[in-house]
């Protein structure tokens, strides 16, 4: 088996975590991730401006109709989970979904080079971590606004066990809160990072296996790569949906009365 794989190992040159880097204020910056994130943000903003210019109270166009369906789906999820108090969560969850999905689409671009010019920003742990921390901060802000400062702290010491076991309650609830940003980050980062590796490995495998078949080999290589990219794009959409859904559920926990948990 090792001898069979030796030719493939010789042509594969995948370097996970390699980026176009530079220094800024003494900090190491992954510039490819920075500009990919900026481009994704510009795409989302541009889509919003286009939608705003084409919005009408009459018969909606296809673009506006798709947007209204997306908003309606998120609104229903928020209403079912949080109720009317969660109206402000709708734009946050929808924006996160669209932005993450746009970032994830970049993973299907530029496969085959040592350093992709436009990598998926979500395949670098810094962006998922930043978004996860932002979500958690906003969730705690909503909890304080909903329960008040006293109720916010009481929530962590008064349940799930009686108040006399407050230290145990604080420990368990503290662990739960620490785990939330970790799971949000690693779920998104891990899937996109692994997906990028699989795309690179598949491209190398197909090139090695069918590289000597001329035009037929080129066609087969393209077909395999396109099919896997479509599959990976579907995974990217699912991960964006999960991130947005968990955001809604975290707000639900923060904004619900204590007796509901």
Residue map of PLM features:
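Selective transmembrane helix interface/packing segments
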Residues: 1-261
